[in-house]
Amino acid sequence: MNNIQIFKIELNNYRQFQGVEEISLETSPDKHINVIEGQNGSGKSNILNAITLCFYNEEPHIDDSNDRGLGADPVANLKELEAIDVGESVRGHIEITLGKDEPQYIFTRKFRTAKVDDDEYNSVIEDLQLRQKFGADWQNVENPNTRLREILPTRVHHTVS
């Protein structure tokens, strides 16, 4: 499949993105590129992290050092986590809509972050899910990782990360 484009990314309680945030990335014949700009800490790198987490269950652009860098933060939005009690959790998801001329696939990866202590969290990332458009209907697809490799070969992932 050639000319796959991401139409939309929906982030729900993912890192800096509190609540549901939709990022439209549709192109048109006269608009072939999207530019994402913003101040440091506004979430630009985490948009790329969200894509790789959704597709490949990896966040290669996270700083894994122990100096409270991004890698030290929970997957779920920190403001949402601060508002809950120990033992409760915040749920979220990353949803990516892509296709050729129109949306054909919706990949979703859900997560849950539990508040273990006031400054300690535990995140669980669920398996990848896929809905594919057949005619006018959207249907769940078994083995979404296999379909993902057909749409976006592994070499594409390694080029990005």
Per-segment meaning from a language model:
Residues 1-56:
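Pre-Walker A-like glycine/lysine-rich segment at the N-terminus of P-loop NTPase domains
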Residues 37, 48-116, 138-156:
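Conserved P-loop NTP-binding catalytic core
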Residues 3-4, 20, 87-91, 104, ...:
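A general secondary-structure signal for short beta-strands and their flanking turns/coil
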Residues 36, 42, 48, 120-124, ...:
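Intrinsic disorder/low-complexity detector
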